[in-house]
Amino acid sequence: VHWTAEEKALINAYWGKVDVGSVGGETLANLLVVYPWTQRFFEDFGNLSTPSAILNNPKXXXXXXXVITSFGDALKNLDNVXXXXXKLSEYHCNKLHVDPVNFRLLGDVLITLSAANFGKXXXXXXXXXXXXLVGVVAHALARRYH
């Protein structure tokens, strides 16, 4: 993807509004609740039997912070997201064996929660650029699967 200067500015402004500490845990928790089959990748996290258990699970919160931080790291290298996510792609493909469609699902949950948290301050142009970014990051993470 070739990002325009305007898209880069929109993405960085959008991400600057994201409360990583809050949205990170919520994003993974919502993914695990709404798409329960994704829980199989987190069996070593312990109790994921209810939404409350997932939200209060310290391992889920730590993994979510790492995931959201990695997403933020991709923003620092928008012109080469595939290279920035190469190690994560290899790890998810070769060690975790995560179904790559889950990367897109996680990104969609992140966009939904962010928009809900932004309220009226969420602009359609920024949400469209963030949705394109989620697709680029999901593709970069799934790259080692091909």
Swiss-Prot record:
Domain Globin: 2-146
GO biological process: hydrogen peroxide catabolic process
SUPFAM superfamilies per the UniProt record, alphabetical: Globin-like (SSF46458)
GO molecular function: haptoglobin binding; heme binding; metal ion binding; organic acid binding; oxygen binding; oxygen carrier activity; peroxidase activity
Keyword Heme among record annotations: yes
Gene3D superfamilies: Globins
Tissue-specificity statement: Red blood cells.
Binding site for heme b: H92
InterPro entries: Globin, Globin-like_sf, Globin/Proto, Hemoglobin_b, Hemoglobin_oxygen_transport
Domain of life: Eukaryota
Keywords: Heme, Iron, Metal-binding, Oxygen transport, Transport
CC annotations in GO: blood microparticle; haptoglobin-hemoglobin complex; hemoglobin complex
Quaternary structure, from the entry: Heterotetramer of two alpha chains and two beta chains.
Family the UniProt entry places it in: Belongs to the globin family.
Function: Involved in oxygen transport from the lung to the various peripheral tissues.
Protein name: Hemoglobin subunit beta-1
Originating species: Saara hardwickii (Indian spiny-tailed lizard)
